[in-house]
Amino acid sequence: MFAPRRLILMSLTIAVLSGCSGTVVSPSQSADAGSAKKASPKKPEIKLPDAAKPSQAQSIPIGGHTPVSRRTALKEFGVELAASRQLSEARVLKLIDEARYNPTVIRIVTPPAAGQPRVPRSWANYRGRFVEPIRINQGRAFMQQYANELDRATKRYGVPQNIIAAIIGVETLYGKSQGNFRVLDALASLGFDYPNPKRPDRAAMFRGQLADLIELDLTGKLDARAIKGSYAGAIGIPQFMPGSIKRFAVSASGSNSIDLSNNMSDAIMSVANFLVEHGWQRGLPVFAPVTLPVSADKLVDGGLKANLDWPQLRAAGAKLAPGAKENAWARAPLGVIDLPEEASGRVELRTATTNFFAITQYNRSYFYAASVADLAQALDTR
């Protein structure tokens, strides 16, 4: 939900980027950092625990062997968080103290070394990972199994059943792959040891998510010591970040208890609510039935908002697709998006509605949102 537009979908990045080179903080390197030079030869050396062995959990205390509460920045973060959100300072610091540095998380987000060739982006390859027989077949079975829950969500929010199912299918293969990283560790690692010093905004974003996770724990909404998710801290069947859980998760039963990891009804309702809160319009398609000329590539602005209209597109040479009619979409904002094959120089252009851009708020990538739309179309058996 927070990735830049051109990042590959998070649920895929573990497989795709786990081999990224760059400055990787390994367990042994962190241990060395934690056991810096002794202040004086007269003082006894402090006995530190051994670094995690490969057979053990691949996480060690934040900042080498130093508990996070003993790192000035982290302690200040905890004190400020407790004060700003009226939380128990002691409980906040105790929870932070249990966070562990996860080198695998850092390796995944470490940028490639300078001079390394960039892998050309391919819409066909990306789409093929999600719009494929396994997800289509399991998606249709999912829609049958949860037909009542999907129907209730569609009636309440106006988001089609196949769109909700497609998002859950892309994110976690319909709940089967929710991630195995302890979210507390992932967010603490990314918030305070983000490997790219040129992106302080990313570190700040992850610290904000860590703050939301801690608040959710201390207010009884989830157990931050146990909850697992993606390497980036996304949680549950719909892969909500902690901030999205706070703002957009809803209970299907109307109770105060929301469980996105085990309760499919809550997950389905929350996905629909998220889309509506980010601009989903009942009755609009994701893409307008329009044929665009090649010259329409100049209308692509790379943004996440529809800034054009149908008269402008017609003036640029766009035409109705065969058999299509002008209806609500023709009176709504539109945008032209590109889906490139960089190696060959080819590009597919589509005319997106507000609903496409609502999906990009889930993951800020044209590839992601178009894959969701295409999978949804494949799931629609009407």
Please identify what each model-predicted range represents.
Residues T23-Q145, D151-T154:
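An acidic, Gly/Ser/Thr/Pro-rich helix-cap/linker signature
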Residues V16-G19:
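C-terminal motif of bacterial Sec signal peptides marking the signal peptidase cleavage site
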Residues A90-G115, I168-T172, F181-S189, P289-D297:
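Acidic helix-start/capping segments at beta-turn-to-alpha-helix junctions
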Residues M1-L9:
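Bacterial N-terminal signal peptides that target proteins for export
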Residues R118-S270:
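Acidic/His-rich structured neighborhood in mature extracellular/periplasmic domains
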Residues R100-P103, E171-G175, A234, Q281, ...:
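Solvent-exposed loop/turn segments at secondary-structure junctions
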